[in-house]
């Protein structure tokens, strides 16, 4: 019995020997050649340098910074290749302040064999790697920080994984990761960068991210707050549900990307926020391209509130239901985009707000284009109090594809500074369509053209209290249909120069025009900018002649007695750049005068001819008046002398002008090729002007003299009536008082061959009577009262050159600014000849 027991004991011991002999433990790392298998660092405050490659099939961590081993420095030069399970190239375990610098590549083949892993409790590690990390095992991450804080990782090289995420941070805070290189992953749930339940980390990457399997995101933040991610490079995903940038249940993060996002799978969104709120900010410069169905460019859903997304680039999608921008059940977000949205799939809207999303703001500078059926440019469904501004055009070509569609949505504010063009001819592709929607405000500064024959605007009977504001630039092809009753309003804010004749398809709107009268029934109004400017036109017509005659009076005040002829030519330009009140006018003319001989009191006769053109407004809200005018008169330059120390002159002028008034009229009933027409009417004006001017010289010395003049004229004008299209403008009598005060100084050179002068003046025009113009629109009488009182402040500089005793040439320039913000520059030149 005893021998039997000994026999089996010896056998057990023998069997146990091989087991004991094959069990190995990593040795302590030591400076010099790299270990053949693995080593550990278990002490503190040591610097190591290892040189050489490691190629091992161990299942241990190859180089391990052990627990409690703090403030060590390891310089590693060489490559590391491992084949075993859990065989990480470098691991850190519950330690602080260690530094790793590696130049070389890492290749692992086993499952859970990360390139670099920080186990829980690692702090203040500083990792610098120049080289690539390649893993092929399941859950073999390139770099993994697990419950570790305040570490810095810097890598120059690429990460490639087959069944794992490239860089992952789990429950880790305040880490800094810098990477120059690309990340490529294969396998399901193999993300490029993943930040899970982690806070206040900073990740910076220069390079591309590419994922090739299901639910593999480029950048993922899950349950993570206050992180900053900076990426310069492209993100590419190829399978279903693989989003480019994905935030889920994450708040107050900042993601900055310069590069493109390309997704190919079903439901693979470019930028996706789900249940993420409170000041997440995503700034992207680059394009988003999706080629899978239901793959949205920018998508916010499930209570993703109060986030900011800024994108400079284009969004392009090519499959069904692939919207450009979608906000679903999310509030108070701001999306700002500079770029275009283009979709080609059925039901692929440009911008979609849906399912109770409220108080969101979308600012877009760019165009929206859709080409498939039921693909609206902007679609609001069951959402309230949102604001959308598009500085660009919306174009749809598919059946039942509206440009702007509001359904069961209230109190939204939408501004389109561009055109809305639809071209489907099936009867349900209105540029703007509302149903079951109330109290919305829509502002349009461009075309609403239905090229397929639908209405340009259509409101169904269940929509009330909506307001459409039409700015200058708006035009319409197709009727303005309102089946919701007179609580819906059309407000025309196009300026005084706009004219329109718009059909409302037999429906009735509340109509408003912010500048002038409007006739109800259909929406009709006539531009009145020329009427408003009539007082200025009268002043401008007489002003160049007054300047010439003032100069003539100065000659007599100086004691001269001119004889012969004189000729004066001038050109003036008016402008007012005030928005919606623009004026651009040009007037040029010539005055020829002759001094009558053998008269006891000096007398001159004169004839003036002027051509002018005045443009009002811009674009489709524009008026033009062209005039040819002739004035003739008698001038008495010294009717009385030594009156209060000066001379008194008098004049009387009579004349007439032929005028052609042209208006651009918006008309939505001209077919599908044009939205406006031009109408014009000719009329004749007559003028009578009589006035006097007092002029005196003072502080006169040999070569310098000062002058002061005060003048006033009474101008009586009459415009005959005329007809232009549906507009009939009644005749108008006008009485205007023009007054002026002018100070001048003249300098003569020693040889008295050149005079140089300056002039400063204040003038006023006051319309005593006739400031109201009566007219008719399609037989309905209305009226408009124009400007009746303006001041003009002028400054001038001139020179005169004496050719001989009987001839001189002169040129004068004058700049004026009116109290109505009209600026004027006039150049005046001519000659005086005594023969």
Predicted segment positions?
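Bacterial N-terminal signal peptides that target proteins for export
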Residues: 2-10
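Beta-strand-rich solenoid/repeat architectures in extracellular/passenger domains
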Residues: 28-35, 45-59, 71-86, 99-112, ...
């Amino acid at each position: 019995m005893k021998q039997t027991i000994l026999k089996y004991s010896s056998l057990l011991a023998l069997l146990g020997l091989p087991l004991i002999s094959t069990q190995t433990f990593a040795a302590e790392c030591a400076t010099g050649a790299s270990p053949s298998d693995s080593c550990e660092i278990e002490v503190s405050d040591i610097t190591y340098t290892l040189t050489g490659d490691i190629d091992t099939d161990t299942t241990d961590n190859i180089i391990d910074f052990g627990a409690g081993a703090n403030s060590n420095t390891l310089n590693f030069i060489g490559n590391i290749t491992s084949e075993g399970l859990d065989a990480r190239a470098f691991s850190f375990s519950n330690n602080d302040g260690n530094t790793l610098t590696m130049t070389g590549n890492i290749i692992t083949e086993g499952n859970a064999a990360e390139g670099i892993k920080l186990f829980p409790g690692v702090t203040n590690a500083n990792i610098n790697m120049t080289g690539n990390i390649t893993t092929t095992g399941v859950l073999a991450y390139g770099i993994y920080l697990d419950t570790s804080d305040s570490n810095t990782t810097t890598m120059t090289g690429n990460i490639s994984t087959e069944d794992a995420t490239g860089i992952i941070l789990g429950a880790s805070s305040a880490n800094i990761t810098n990477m120059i290189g690309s990340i490529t992953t294969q396998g399901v749930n193999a993300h490029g960068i993943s930040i899970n339940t982690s806070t206040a980390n900073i990740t910076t990457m220069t390079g591309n991210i590419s994922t090739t399997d299901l639910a593999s995101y480029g950048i993922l933040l899950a349950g993570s707050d206050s992180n900053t991610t900076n990426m310069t490079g492209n993100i590419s995903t190829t399978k279903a549900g693989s989003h480019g940038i994905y935030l889920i249940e994450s708040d107050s993060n900042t993601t900055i990307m310069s590069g493109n996002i390309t997704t190919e799978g079903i439901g693979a969104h470019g930028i996706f926020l789900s249940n993420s709120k409170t000041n997440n900010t995503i700034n992207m410069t680059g394009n988003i391209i999706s080629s899978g169905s239901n793959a949205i460019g920018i998508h916010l859903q499930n209570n993703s509130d109060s986030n900011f997304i800024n994108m400079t680039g284009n969004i392009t999608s090519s499959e069904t239901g692939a919207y450009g921008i979608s906000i679903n059940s999310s509030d108070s977000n701001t999306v700002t985009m500079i770029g275009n949205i283009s979709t080609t799939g059925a039901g692929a809207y440009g911008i979609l707000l849906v399912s109770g999303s409220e108080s969101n703001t979308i600012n877009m500078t760019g165009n929206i284009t859709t080409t498939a059926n039921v693909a609206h440019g902007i679609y609001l469904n069951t959402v309230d109090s949102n604001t959308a501004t598009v500085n660009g055009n919306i174009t749809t070509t598919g059946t039942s594809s509206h440009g702007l569609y509001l359904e069961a949505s209230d109190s939204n504010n939408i501004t389109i500074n561009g055109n809305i063009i639809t071209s489907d001819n099936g009867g349900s592709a209105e540029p703007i369509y509302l149903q079951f929607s109330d109290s919305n405000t829509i502002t349009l500064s461009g075309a609403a053209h239905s090229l397929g024959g639908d209405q340009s605007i259509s409101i169904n009977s269940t929509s009330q209290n909506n307001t459409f504001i039409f700015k200058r630039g708006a035009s319409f092809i197709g009727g303005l249909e309102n089946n919701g009753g007179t609580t819906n309003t059309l407000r025309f804010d196009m300026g005084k120069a706009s004219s329109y004749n718009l059909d409302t398809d037999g429906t009735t709107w509340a109509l408003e025009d912010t500048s002038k009268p409007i006739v109800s029934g259909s929406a009709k109004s006539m531009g009145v900018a020329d009427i408003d400017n009539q007082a200025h036109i009268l002043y401008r017509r007489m002003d160049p002649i007054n300047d010439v005659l003032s100069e003539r009076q100065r000659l007599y005040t100086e004691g001269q007695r001119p004889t012969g002829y004189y000729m004066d030519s001038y050109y003036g330009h008016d402008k007012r750049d005030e928005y919606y009140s623009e004026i651009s006018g040009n007037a040029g003319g010539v005055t020829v005068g002759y001094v009558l001989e053998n008269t006891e009191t000096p007398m001159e006769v004169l004839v003036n001819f002027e051509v002018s053109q005045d443009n009002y407004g811009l674009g489709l809200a524009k008026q033009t008046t062209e005039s040819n005018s002739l004035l003739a008169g008698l001038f008495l330059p010294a009717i009385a002398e030594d009156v209060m120390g000066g001379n008194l002159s008098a004049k009387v002028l009579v004349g007439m002008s032929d005028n052609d008034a042209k208006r651009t009229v918006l008309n939505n009933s001209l077919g599908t090729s044009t939205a406006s027409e031009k109408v014009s009417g000719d009329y004749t004006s007559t003028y009578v002007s009589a006035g006097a001017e007092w002029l005196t010289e003072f502080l006169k010395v040999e070569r310098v003299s000062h002058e002061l003049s005060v003048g006033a004229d009474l101008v009586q004008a009459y415009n005959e009536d005329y007809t232009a299209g549906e507009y009939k403008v009644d005749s108008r009598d006008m009485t205007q008082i023009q007054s002026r005060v002018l100070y001048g100084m003249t300098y003569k050179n020693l040889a008295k061959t050149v005079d140089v002068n300056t002039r400063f003046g204040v003038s006023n025009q006051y319309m005593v009577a006739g400031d109201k113009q009566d007219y008719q629109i399609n037989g309905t009488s209305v009226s408009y009262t124009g400007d009746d009182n303006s001041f003009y402040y002028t400054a001038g500089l001139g020179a005169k050159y004496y050719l001989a005793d009987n001839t001189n040439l002169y040129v004068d320039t004058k700049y004026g600014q009116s109290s109505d913000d009209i600026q004027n520059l006039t150049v005046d030149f001519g000659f005086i000849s005594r023969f």
